[in-house]
Swiss-Prot record:
<dbReference type="GO" id="GO:0007218">
    <property type="term" value="P:neuropeptide signaling pathway"/>
</dbReference>
<comment type="function">
    <text>Myoactive.</text>
</comment>
<keyword id="KW-0527">Neuropeptide</keyword>
<keyword id="KW-0027">Amidation</keyword>
<dbReference type="InterPro" id="IPR001484">
    <property type="entry name" value="Pyrokinin_CS"/>
</dbReference>
<keyword id="KW-0964">Secreted</keyword>
<comment type="similarity">
    <text>Belongs to the pyrokinin family.</text>
</comment>
<dbReference type="GO" id="GO:0005576">
    <property type="term" value="C:extracellular region"/>
</dbReference>
<protein>
    <recommendedName>
        <fullName>Pyrokinin-5b</fullName>
    </recommendedName>
</protein>
<dbReference type="GO" id="GO:0005184">
    <property type="term" value="F:neuropeptide hormone activity"/>
</dbReference>
<feature type="modified residue" description="Leucine amide">
    <location>
        <position position="17"/>
    </location>
</feature>
Length: 17
């Protein structure tokens, strides 16, 4: 969840906000 972060495979925020 955030920048350069894959949270739940892009379900919440994604690889980039």
């Amino acid at each position: 969840g955030g920048e350069s972060s894959n949270e739940a495979k892009g379900m919440w925020f994604g690889p980039r906000l």
